[in-house]
């Protein structure tokens, strides 16, 4: 028995091999188990590692990474493919994500849809095409955009530029010309997107469009957020305008973005990641209808656009640039209709083409218009350039003015509300001699 005890204490234990695959640990042999036990090699090494050979490697210090590091871009998402949001879903622990169904967990649009709907691209050079940009307008817009991309010491630059003025004065088109001149592709919004059947949706859309513009700036290209007719979507036009919660949230969102332009978060996501500053340009007709704290000087810089005579002549030269109209005739045309908007002259030019369209309809027949325009193998019709004389332009201009006066003078809505029958609705046409019947 003593022999058996002594043999049990002689069990051989192979030391662990830290080198891995060159040698392997063997099954311990024992006299007690018998001398016929075969030794086999195991593919697994002992996981117990000696503390004397343990090597600890520190993590990489990101502060020591320089801008010259060729692999630096791997740590940042530089793709503009919105489907990256969907592909990355589930890669991050839920602790660091916002609640489901909010934020950017789900792709809002594909990249092509962003380009086709939100992103406005320009493929023309306004200097070559002869478009006129008013110097005062260009100065105000260029200075505002440039200031917002600069870091000025001890100075708070207003984020929003509000351009307002009369209807049809070319505010939006002048902005687009300046954007094209500066090679900026702005993210566009309109007043129709500032209201929704869902409460809070327009405010969320403003933040999404702002962050989309910030992503473009982060990738090294200038961008801006351009909102058309802000007062029509967020203002109060008389006592009959219904003031909804979306109007309130749109005003509050723009105020919050103007106060914190580099920390614009989506609803439900509150990480402290800064975004580039994006200048916001808005247009409108009457900013007195907006919420007063939004248009205060620290948040919005206001610019009243009233084109001078020289501006109107310059814009009209651009409108009639392909019609071979002499500059003297354009000056006479502008001076003949001094109270009209710039858009009036564009409508006047379109009215001249009515004669050519009327000739084409007479040639093909009224019953064949659909076949020729919608389902035709011949392609769209082409017209010769109509000759525009000053006499014809003045004639059509007076016709447009007369139509404007009729709208202001003959207010049939008041007659319909005050009388059950048609009443004197045709009296104006009878008095002017244009009523036949």
UniProtKB/Swiss-Prot annotation:
Where in or outside the cell it occurs: the entry states: Plastid, Chloroplast stroma
TM region positions = none
Q: Where does ATP bind?
A: 165-172
The alphabetized UniProt keywords are: ATP-binding, Chloroplast, Nucleotide-binding, Plastid, Transit peptide
One Pfam match, by short name? AAA
Q: Name one GO molecular function term.
A: ATP hydrolysis activity
Residue numbers spanned by region Disordered: 1-26
Q: Name one GO cellular component term.
A: chloroplast stroma
**Where are the compositionally biased (Polar residues) regions?**
1-10
> Family assignment?
Belongs to the RuBisCO activase family.
Q: What does this protein do?
A: Activation of RuBisCO (ribulose-1,5-bisphosphate carboxylase/oxygenase; EC 4.1.1.39) involves the ATP-dependent carboxylation of the epsilon-amino group of lysine leading to a carbamate structure.
Protein's name according to its UniProt entry? Ribulose bisphosphate carboxylase/oxygenase activase, chloroplastic
Which gene is annotated as encoding this protein in its UniProt record?
Answer: RCA
């Amino acid at each position: 028995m003593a022999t058996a005890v002594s043999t049990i204490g002689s069990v051989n234990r192979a030391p662990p091999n830290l080198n891995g695959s060159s040698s392997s640990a063997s099954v311990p042999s024992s006299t007690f188990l018998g001398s016929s036990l075969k030794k086999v090699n195991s593919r697994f090494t002992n996981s117990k590692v000696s503390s004397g050979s343990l090597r600890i490697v520190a993590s990489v210090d990101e502060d020591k990474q320089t801008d010259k590091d060729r692999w630096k871009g791997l740590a940042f998402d530089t793709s503009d493919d919105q489907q990256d949001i969907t592909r990355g879903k589930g890669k991050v622990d839920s602790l660091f994500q916002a609640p489901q169904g909010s934020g950017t967990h789900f792709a809002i649009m594909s990249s092509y849809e962003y380009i086709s709907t939100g992103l406005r691209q320009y493929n023309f050079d306004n200097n070559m095409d002869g478009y006129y940009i008013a110097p005062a307008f260009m100065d105000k817009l260029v200075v505002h955009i440039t200031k917002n991309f600069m870091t000025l010491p001890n100075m708070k630059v207003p984020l929003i530029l509000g351009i307002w003025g009369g209807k049809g004065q070319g505010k939006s088109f002048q902005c687009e010309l300046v954007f094209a001149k500066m090679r900026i592709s702005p993210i566009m919004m309109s007043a129709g997107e500032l209201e929704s059947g869902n409460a809070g949706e327009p405010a969320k859309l403003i933040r999404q469009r702002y962050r989309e513009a910030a992503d473009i700036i982060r990738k090294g290209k200038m961008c801006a957020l351009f909102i058309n007719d802000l007062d029509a979507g967020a203002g109060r036009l008389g006592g009959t305008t219904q003031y909804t919660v979306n109007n309130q949230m749109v005003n509050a969102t723009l105020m919050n973005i103007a106060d914190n332009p580099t920390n614009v978060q989506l609803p439900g996501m509150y990480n402290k990641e800064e975004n580039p500053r994006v200048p916001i340009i808005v247009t409108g007709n009457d900013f007195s209808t907006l919420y007063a704290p939004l248009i205060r000087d620290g948040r919005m810089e206001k610019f009243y656009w009233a084109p001078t005579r020289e501006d109107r002549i310059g814009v009209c030269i651009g409108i009639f640039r392909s019609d071979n109209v002499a500059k003297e005739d354009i000056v006479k045309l502008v001076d003949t209709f001094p109270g009209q908007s710039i858009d009036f002259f564009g409508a006047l030019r379109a009215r001249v083409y009515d004669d050519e369209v009327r000739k084409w309809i007479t040639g093909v027949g009224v019953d064949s218009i659909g076949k020729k325009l919608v389902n035709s193998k011949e392609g769209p019709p082409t017209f010769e350039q109509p000759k525009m004389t000053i006499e014809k332009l003045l004639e059509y201009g007076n016709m447009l003015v007369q139509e404007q006066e009729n709208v202001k003078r003959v207010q049939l809505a008041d007659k319909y509300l005050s009388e059950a029958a048609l009443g004197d609705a045709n009296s104006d046409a009878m008095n002017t001699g244009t009523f036949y019947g």
